[in-house]
């Protein structure tokens, strides 16, 4: 600095000229000095600093000039110059400030020029103008001048660039206003004013400056906005006048003015803006538009947004002069619009935002200000024209431009919602709304809301919730504008051609939301009444509906006089009749709302009125209806009108009389009037009620109240009952709906009287009621009769006699005969050896320990030895004669013998030891097993055959859990089966081995497969046809236990699945081999056998054996062929059950048809290729006769057997047996065929009769019995005699030789059964009184033959046959092995269901069980039968009838085409469903009903049911659980699991049917969870497994379901209900979600989404705490929005019902997660959703992805302005700012830079980022006061263009 010292010293000289010269010299030297002494050197810097910091103004002034010259000449760097001047400015004296500011201004202009107008700074703080302003306050004056100079100097470079350069400075100036003193505010105003002045001076370059100032408006504090707007408007008016005058940029300046007005109003009408007086702002904006209009500019349709903002401001305003100002503005706009020359009808409709003004303007008509009323009326007159135009052009689409801003405003949201309502066919939003989400998804009213939901219903729910909150917190209230805006929408919709009525309902709801709306609504009613009365309005029909709104306004006490005053003019005597009648009804409804109106109403309802207006029908009816309403709602008030009630009854007008009777009925109901006293007065007016159905209905409605005092007035009560019965039983007009209503009323009235009283007054009352029910077809009347019948049954049960249980006495001669058979056949005193009657001995001999002593084992050995010796004798004498039929009968008898033997052993062990039941059974069976094996080792062939059968019988009689015994027996029999050299061992061993396989335990898979494999091996390898046939029978037995368990199907366990596959393969091999062998024996082509083989193709592991190897070509033994082929056919017939379970129903039908075709003389019934060979058919006929009953029995159970087939097949058997009896040829085939046909015919007939499905002709039964009698009494071989006797026995149900199906013991016929001549019989013959008498001689005859010792062989067969019948009749008494196993079967059967004949239960039961019951009529219709079943389902007990047969017949009856179907019966109600429900109700009492339910629940049978019955069964899983055993329920749950899994891929169901079935399954599982307890863990595990499988196929819940997706809504509803009832620990574990990764194969993304949705729904219902849902925040909000949209909505719907603290926490957490999430749009959209559903404007918001973000400008700002959310506003805005910076950086940088700087944001967010930034920026600006200044500046610096 030394080199400059001399010159610097001269600057201190107090001489200005010397000082200036010194400064010039210093800077000249700096300019020319070498580098080490230049301006950049230390000495140079110090010299410059010395000059600038001088206290002399002259020195500083010259220094600034010289410094600027250095910079201008590029000697000094610009930044250095700015730095020097800025530093000097900050430390200078105040008098020097202007000098430095001027210098800085000059340098800024130079810098801008050098950068060609593109001078940018990295932050607002570095902006030179900002630095100047920030340095000190004194700079402001000069700074304004420098800014103007900058603009004027640099405008040549482009005004747009100049404005961009100044924008940060302008924003900084504005943003500093709230943080500094008033000078900052003043400076900002002056700065804006200065720039506005520049616009005036540079009119052709003014538009960019205007745009700059408009962009800054959003940062201006509200108290400064008024002045700023006035400045801008004044400047604009100058500019626009000039530009329009010159014709330049007219369009741009026009649009700019509209944008300015819209932008200012957008700020003023924002929800977060506090209500302040904005009159001057509005006046300024109006002035701007007035200038445009004066200049001739056209009305812009963009002004529709201005109107929308004014609508909101008008609704929100409470200040009169502000309201007046807005009205004047609106009036100006509307006039301008209507004066526009280009406005057409379409334009008016397209810009119909003005229609929203209707209700707010009407509301202002109640203002006390005359000026407001005048202005409002002017606006209303113009709006009315728009409204009428819109109502006449409802199909024109409405659009509104949103200008440059995509952000919503309250007005646009309301208008958009109104548009959507207008352009649809109902009041249901086409897209889902937030109201729907809030109040229908998963709520307690979800069932109500399935399907379309109207805005009315949702709004009503919203209003109810509002009042609930209001009750909890008195401070809670809605903003003033909400009900007005709701009214604005509804007011427009009133004019809709089809939705006007719903809109009026909405107005009613709005009145309930805010009591202050009563007067506006009254004015709206008056206005619309006037408007709708005009001819040019197409909605005149709404007038009455609109007037109906008046009474609802009377809820406010102050409104009563106004409402009554409004109605009163319509009650003038000269008024029109219809108007007068309407006024009466309105006044009545007003009284309903508020009792203060009663005096006015009472005056109108005077009795004289009916005389005065006798010719005015409408008025009289209106008066009567009002009287009726008063009596119904307030009986005490009704007493005041009693004379008017009497006048109604005495009227000649039927509707008036009817209403009078109804009014009196309500008074009697309330007991304010005595019924019989009133009846004495008015009964003369009820004499001709049958002439008018309405009158009859009303009188019946009255007469039911006579029940209370009927005993006190018996005569009058009897007359009343006669009237009711006469009307109720009248069928004069069966299809008249009015008479139907009257009859229902009469029957309901009868139900009010005591049953005992009616029985005393009516003879045969029950019979008449039953006849009436069975003769009725109308569904409504049937329902009423059901209720009456149920009441009668309950009464009968309550007064029933207490029957004493007496010792059972045989009820018929047949039973008496059967009871004495053991004593007669084996008398104690005679020596009749067991070996002479071996068959009877097996069934009758019984040895019981009589001298058993504790601790003694002698009795056990004695009894065991007795049975062993008897068995030795029997096996030696019982000849099977290589007859498979005899073998089966012997096996059946041996099973009974083994059961008695075991029972005796167990009883003996009971007396000697105290062991467990299973141990006793095992010990007793082991002893028998040892004895049998010991005897078998050295037995003769005949004995060996029987012993092999005995082993099978022993195992069949054992419990399934006896593994060891059955395994030992199987091993022993397998060894015999494989001894090909011993045929006598092989063939019976094969039969027994199959029987054992059918009774193995579920876990004995290996043993079962070994047995079946052994049978298949011998079937293929044996050369004996008899052995092949026996193996066929054994395989048939084995099929009974194949594919019976389905836990494998529903399990993911590989071994279980493999087990089922093995069973399917084994079944295929069995059917394939049997078909192939039979085909070979047939020697002719047979399509059915070939198709059966094709249905079960061989597997890879099968050894395909050729047909020649399967057949023994050298076998010429005709006897072997007959029984061998019979065995194969029987085996094939036995396999139908397994085939059906395998899902091959067609194969079952084919087998049935094939076997029928093999019966001789059946060719006319079924034709099958290859059946023409007589020899083949004769060989096959024996087996087909024996197999057919088995097949038909199964087909009956699964409904594959038609009624018309019964008579045909029975006829075939009759013809066959008749032919065989007539032809006297001898021969083995003939006698075997005769035996087989008799056994088969009897078994078939017995099966058909016991099932009870198909009635059989009486003559056919008699003819068959006569043929059987001829057979056993004629000169035929003994085996034929045996067949005839077994035919008789089988007809009675004994099922001799049939080990697959057994029939329940027949019930004794009713003691008082009438022996009427009948043509058909249904049910067991022994349960029929007529046939019991007919059969007694037949049984006696067989009994006598069994006593005849002349023919021992015949005696043997007779004794055996009669013993089989005795065993069958005693089957219910001795079916268990031990006393403890006889749980309740015997008790249940012994319950005395003594129901008298005259009772209602018996009459109904007889009508259903007996098709020929006299009361039933012919034919019964389905609806009638269903009603009778429903009645009996409620019966406390049923008579002891054959209910199993009845239900099966009714099940079949509905599917028959000849059954009448009432047209009144709803299609969804089916007789089959009622059969199921009836069975479920009484299955605990009747075993046959339990068996019926067991069959229906079997998976294969269940799959064949119709969809409606499947749904019904699934819905009642809980009921089944109450009656099924534990093991059966386990199997049922496994079946359900299997069905659920298979349902998804089943093509036989439609999507709706699948959904319906799943819904039913959810309902059933819910029932099961209610029935189970925590202790029944096994059930719970099974249920939970079903839930998991159902949940897996549950569709992801959609928040906007289409009409075809409503099934999924129902599914979710039931699923959530079910999950609510599940155990909490399991539920939390099941719904646990660890991560959400779409596309990741390791995770089930869709399943996880459903779990989250389920958890949200449960949280909404309070079943799961919100803390559980909160654990998933981070997982959910880090996913892409498109993947989880529905999940987000579900969570928001749940949070809507949460506490405020939970909502606020979710709001904060969501925006915080957006700061780190790779998908920030998801979190922000979630914030938008949550804000939408929680803010006040929720009723107007549609749930649309495209609008959620844009609506956040309304929803979030509204929510954060709520006092309850103010506590979270600051942290929310802080996190939102952080997220905004992150997303803005991502959106503005290139892809490469974005990856580096914002690595966590996914690239899929790039398209959403601009909109995200815009929304977040707007919210941050709106709440910028919660951000520090530096963040506000960065916020303002963000480019939003």
Curated annotation (Swiss-Prot):
It comes from the Eukaryota. It comes from Arabidopsis thaliana. Pfam families: DUF3730. Signal peptide: none annotated. This is Protein RST1. The keyword Kinase does not apply. One of its GO terms (biological process) is embryo development ending in seed dormancy. Interacts with CER16/RIPR. It is a multi-pass membrane protein. The gene is RST1. Disruption phenotype: Shrunken non viable seeds due to arrested embryo development when homozygous. Alteration in cuticular waxes with elevated amounts of cutin monomers in leaves. Susceptibility to the obligate biotrophic fungus E.cichoracearum and increased resistance to the necrotrophic fungi B.cinerea and A.brassicicola. The chain crosses the membrane at residues 250-270, 296-316, 347-367, 479-499, 513-533, 546-566, 943-963, 982-1002, 1123-1143, 1175-1195, 1229-1249, 1277-1297, 1719-1739. Involved in cuticular wax formation. Required for the synthesis of alkanes from wax precursors. May play a role in acyl-CoA reduction to aldehydes. Is repressed by FREE1 and functions downstream of FREE1 to negatively regulate multivesicular body (MVB) biogenesis and vacuolar transport. Together with CER16/RIPR, acts as a cofactor of the cytoplasmic exosome and connects the cytosolic RNA exosome to the SKI complex. Acts as a post-transcriptional gene silencing (PTGS) suppressor. Expressed in the vasculature of leaves, petioles and hypocotyls, anthers of mature flowers and siliques. Expressed at low levels in roots and stems. One of its GO terms (cellular component) is plasma membrane. Keywords: Cell membrane, Cytoplasm, Lipid metabolism, Membrane, Plant defense, Transmembrane, Transmembrane helix. Residues 1374-1393 are annotated as: Disordered. It is found in: Cell membrane; Cytoplasm, Cytosol.
């Amino acid at each position: 600095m030394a080199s400059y010292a001399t010159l610097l010293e001269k600057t201190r000289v107090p001489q200005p000229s010397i000082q200036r010269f010194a400064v010039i010299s210093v800077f000249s030297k700096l300019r020319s000095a070498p580098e080490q002494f230049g301006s950049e050197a230390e000495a140079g810097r110090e010299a410059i600093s010395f000059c600038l910091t001088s206290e002399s103004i002259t020195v500083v002034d010259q220094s600034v000039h010289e410094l600027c010259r250095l910079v201008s000449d590029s000697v000094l760097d610009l930044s250095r110059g700015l730095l020097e001047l800025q530093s000097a400015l900050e430390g200078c004296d105040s008098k020097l400030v202007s000098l430095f500011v001027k210098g800085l201004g000059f340098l800024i202009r130079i810098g801008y020029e050098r950068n060609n107008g593109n001078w940018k700074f990295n932050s607002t703080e570095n902006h030179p103008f900002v630095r100047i302003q920030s340095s000190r306050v004194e700079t402001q004056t000069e700074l304004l001048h420098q800014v103007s100079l900058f603009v004027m100097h640099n405008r040549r470079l482009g005004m747009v660039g100049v404005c961009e350069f100044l924008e940060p400075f302008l924003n900084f100036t504005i943003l500093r206003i709230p943080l500094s003193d008033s000078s900052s505010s003043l400076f900002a105003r002056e700065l804006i004013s200065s720039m506005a002045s520049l616009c005036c001076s540079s009119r052709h370059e003014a538009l960019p400056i205007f745009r700059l100032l408009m962009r800054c408006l959003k940062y201006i504090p509200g108290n400064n906005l008024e002045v700023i707007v006035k400045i801008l408007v004044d400047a604009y008016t100058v500019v626009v006048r000039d530009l329009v005058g010159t014709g330049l940029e007219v369009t741009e300046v026009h649009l700019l003015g509209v944008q300015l007005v819209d932008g200012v109003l957008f700020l003023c009408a924002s929800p977060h803006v506090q209500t302040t007086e904005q009159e001057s702002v509005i006046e300024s904006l109006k002035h701007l538009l007035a200038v445009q209009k004066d200049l001739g500019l056209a009305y812009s349709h963009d002004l529709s947004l201005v109107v929308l903002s004014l609508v909101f401001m008008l609704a929100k305003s409470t200040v009169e002069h502000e309201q007046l100002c807005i009205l004047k503005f609106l009036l100006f706009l509307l006039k301008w619009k209507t004066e526009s020359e280009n406005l057409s009808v379409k334009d008016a409709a397209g810009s119909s935002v003005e229609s929203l003004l209707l209700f707010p303007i009407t509301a202002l008509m109640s203002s006390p200000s005359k000026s407001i009323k005048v202005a409002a009326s002017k606006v209303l007159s113009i709006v009315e024209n728009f409204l009428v135009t819109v109502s006449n052009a409802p199909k024109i689409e409405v659009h509104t431009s949103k200008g440059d801003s995509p952000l919503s405003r309250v007005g646009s949201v309301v208008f958009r919602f109104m548009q959507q309502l207008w352009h649809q066919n109902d009041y249901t939003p086409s897209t889902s709304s937030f109201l729907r989400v809030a109040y229908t998804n998963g709520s307690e009213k979800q069932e109500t809301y399935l399907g379309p939901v109207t805005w009315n219903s949702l709004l009503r729910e919203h209003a109810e919730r509002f009042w609930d909150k209001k009750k909890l917190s008195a401070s809670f209230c809605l903003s003033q504008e909400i009900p007005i805006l709701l009214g604005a929408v509804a007011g427009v919709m009133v004019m809709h051609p089809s939705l006007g009525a719903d809109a009026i309902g909405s107005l009613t709801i709005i009145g309930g939301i805010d009591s202050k709306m009563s007067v506006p609504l009254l004015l709206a009613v008056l206005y619309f009444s006037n408007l709708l009365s005009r001819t040019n309005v197409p909605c005149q029909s709404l007038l009455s509906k609109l007037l109906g709104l008046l009474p609802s306004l009377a809820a406010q006490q102050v409104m009563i006089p106004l409402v009554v005053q409004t109605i009163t003019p319509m009650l003038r005597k000269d008024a029109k009749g219809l108007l007068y009648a309407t006024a009466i009804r309105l006044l009545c409804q007003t009284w309903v709302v508020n009792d203060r109106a009663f005096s006015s109403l009472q005056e109108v309802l005077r009795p004289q009125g009916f005389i005065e207006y006798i010719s005015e029908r409408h008025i009289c009816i209106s008066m009567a209806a009002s009287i009726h309403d008063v009596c119904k709602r307030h009986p005490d008030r009704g007493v005041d009108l009693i004379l008017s009630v009497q006048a109604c009854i005495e009227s000649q007008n039927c509707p008036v009389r009817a209403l009078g009777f109804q009014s009196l009925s309500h008074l009697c109901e309330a007991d304010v009037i005595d019924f019989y006293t009133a009846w004495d007065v008015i009964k003369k007016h009820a004499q001709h009620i049958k002439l008018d159905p309405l009158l009859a209905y009303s009188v019946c409605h009255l007469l039911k109240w006579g029940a209370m005092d009927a005993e006190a007035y018996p005569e009058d009560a009897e007359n009343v009952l006669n009237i009711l019965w006469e009307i109720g039983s009248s069928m004069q007009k069966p299809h008249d709906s009015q008479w139907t209503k009257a009859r229902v009323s009469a029957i309901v009235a009868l139900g009010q009287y005591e049953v005992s009283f009616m029985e005393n007054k009516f003879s045969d009352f029950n019979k008449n009621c039953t006849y009436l029910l069975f003769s009725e077809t109308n569904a409504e009347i049937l329902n009423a009769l059901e209720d009456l019948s149920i009441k009668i049954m309950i009464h009968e049960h309550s007064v029933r006699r207490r029957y004493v249980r007496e010792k059972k006495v045989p009820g018929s001669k047949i039973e008496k005969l059967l009871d004495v058979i053991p004593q007669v056949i084996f008398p104690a005193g005679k020596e009749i050896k067991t070996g002479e009657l071996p068959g009877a001995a097996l069934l009758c001999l019984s040895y019981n320990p009589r001298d058993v002593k504790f601790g003694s084992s002698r009795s056990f050995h004695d009894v065991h030895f007795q049975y062993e010796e008897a068995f030795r004798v029997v096996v030696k004498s019982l000849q099977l004669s290589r007859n498979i039929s005899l073998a089966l009968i012997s096996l059946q008898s041996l099973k009974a013998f083994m059961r008695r033997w075991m029972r005796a052993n167990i009883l003996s062990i009971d007396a000697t030891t105290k062991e467990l039941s299973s141990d006793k059974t095992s010990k007793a069976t082991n002893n028998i097993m040892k004895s049998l094996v010991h005897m078998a080792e050295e037995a003769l062939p005949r004995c060996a055959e029987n012993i092999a059968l005995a082993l099978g019988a022993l195992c069949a009689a054992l419990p399934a859990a006896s593994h060891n015994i059955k395994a030992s027996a199987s091993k022993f029999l397998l060894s015999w089966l494989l001894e090909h050299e011993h045929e006598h061992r092989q063939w019976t061993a094969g039969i027994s081995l199959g029987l054992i396989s059918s009774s193995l335990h579920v876990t004995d898979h290996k043993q079962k497969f070994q047995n079946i494999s052994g049978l298949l091996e011998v079937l293929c390898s044996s050369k004996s046809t008899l052995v092949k046939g026996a193996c066929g029978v054994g395989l048939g037995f084995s099929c009974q236990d194949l594919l019976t368990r389905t836990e494998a199907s529903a399990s993911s366990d590989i071994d279980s699945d493999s087990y089922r596959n093995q069973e399917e393969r084994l079944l295929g091999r069995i059917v394939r081999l049997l078909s192939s062998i039979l085909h070979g024996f047939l020697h002719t082509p047979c399509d059915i056998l070939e198709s059966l083989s094709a249905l079960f193709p061989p597997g890879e592991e099968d050894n395909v054996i050729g047909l020649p190897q399967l057949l023994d070509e050298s076998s010429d033994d005709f006897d072997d062929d007959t029984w061998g082929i019979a065995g194969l056919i029987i085996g094939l017939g036995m396999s139908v059950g397994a085939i059906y379970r395998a899902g091959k129903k067609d194969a079952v039908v084919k087998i049935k048809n094939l076997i029928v075709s093999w019966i001789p003389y059946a060719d006319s019934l079924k034709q099958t290729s290859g059946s023409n060979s007589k020899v083949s058919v004769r060989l096959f006929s024996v087996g087909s006769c024996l197999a057919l009953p088995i097949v038909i029995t199964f087909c009956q159970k699964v409904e594959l057997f038609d009624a018309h087939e019964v008579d045909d097949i029975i006829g075939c058997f009759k013809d066959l047996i008749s032919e065989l009896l007539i032809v006297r040829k001898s021969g083995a085939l003939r006698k075997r065929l005769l035996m087989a046909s008799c056994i088969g015919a009897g078994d078939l007939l017995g099966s058909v009769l016991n099932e009870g499905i198909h009635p059989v002709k009486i003559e056919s039964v008699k003819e068959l019995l006569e043929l059987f009698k001829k057979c056993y009494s004629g000169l035929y071989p003994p085996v034929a005699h045996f067949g005839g006797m077994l035919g008789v026995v089988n007809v009675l149900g004994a099922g001799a030789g049939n080990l697959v199906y057994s029939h329940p013991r027949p019930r004794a016929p009713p003691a008082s059964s009438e022996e009427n001549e009948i043509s058909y019989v249904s049910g067991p013959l022994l349960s029929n009184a007529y046939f019991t008498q007919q059969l007694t001689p037949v049984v006696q005859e067989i009994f006598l033959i069994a006593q005849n010792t002349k023919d021992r062989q015949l005696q043997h067969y007779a004794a055996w046959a009669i013993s089989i019948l005795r065993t069958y009749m005693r089957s219910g008494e001795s079916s268990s092995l031990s006393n403890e196993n006889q749980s309740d079967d015997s008790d249940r059967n012994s319950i005395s269901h003594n129901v008298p004949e005259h009772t209602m239960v018996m009459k109904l039961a007889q009508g259903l069980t007996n098709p020929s019951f006299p009361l039933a009529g012919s034919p019964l219709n389905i609806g009638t039968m269903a009603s009778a079943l429903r009645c009996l389902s409620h019966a406390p007990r049923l008579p002891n009838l054959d209910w199993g047969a009845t239900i099966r017949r009714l099940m079949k009856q509905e599917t028959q085409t000849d059954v009448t179907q009432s047209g009144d019966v709803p299609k969804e109600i089916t007789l089959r469903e009622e059969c199921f429900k009836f069975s479920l109700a009484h299955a605990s009492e009747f075993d046959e009903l339990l068996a019926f339910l067991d069959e229906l629940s079997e998976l294969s049978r269940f799959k064949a049911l119709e969809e409606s019955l499947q749904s019904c069964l699934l819905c009642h899983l809980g009921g089944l659980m109450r009656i099924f055993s534990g093991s059966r329920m386990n199997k049922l749950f496994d079946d359900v699991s299997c069905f659920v899994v298979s349902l998804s891929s089943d093509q036989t169901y439609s999507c709706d049917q699948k959904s319906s079935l799943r819904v039913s399954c959810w309902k059933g599982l819910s029932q099961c969870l209610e029935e189970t307890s925590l202790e029944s863990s096994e059930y719970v595990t099974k249920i939970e497994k079903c839930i998991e499988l159902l949940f897996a196929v549950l569709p992801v819940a959609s928040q906007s379901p289409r009409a075809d997706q409503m099934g999924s809504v129902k599914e979710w509803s039931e699923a959530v209900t079910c999950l609510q009832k599940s155990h909490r620990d399991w539920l939390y574990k099941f719904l646990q979600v660890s991560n959400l990764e779409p596309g990741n194969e390791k995770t089930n993304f869709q399943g996880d989404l459903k779990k989250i949705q389920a958890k949200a729904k449960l949280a909404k219902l309070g079943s799961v705490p919100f803390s559980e849902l909160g654990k998933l925040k981070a997982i959910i909000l880090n996913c892409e929005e498109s993947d989880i949209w529905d999940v987000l909505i579900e969570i928001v719907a749940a949070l809507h019902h949460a506490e405020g603290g939970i909502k606020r926490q979710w709001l904060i957490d969501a925006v915080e997660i957006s700061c780190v999430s790779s998908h920030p749009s998801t979190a922000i959209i979630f914030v938008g959703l949550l804000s939408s559903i929680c803010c006040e404007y929720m009723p107007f918001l549609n749930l649309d992805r495209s609008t959620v973000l844009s609506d956040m400008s309304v929803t979030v700002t509204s929510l954060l302005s709520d006092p309850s959310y103010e506590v979270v506003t600051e942290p929310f805005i802080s996190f939102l700012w952080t997220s905004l910076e992150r997303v803005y950086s991502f959106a503005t940088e290139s892809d490469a830079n974005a990856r580096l700087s914002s690595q966590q944001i996914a690239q899929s967010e790039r398209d959403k980022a601009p909109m995200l930034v815009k929304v977040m920026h707007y919210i941050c600006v709106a709440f910028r006061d919660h951000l520090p200044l530096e963040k506000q500046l960065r916020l303002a610096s963000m480019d939003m263009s």
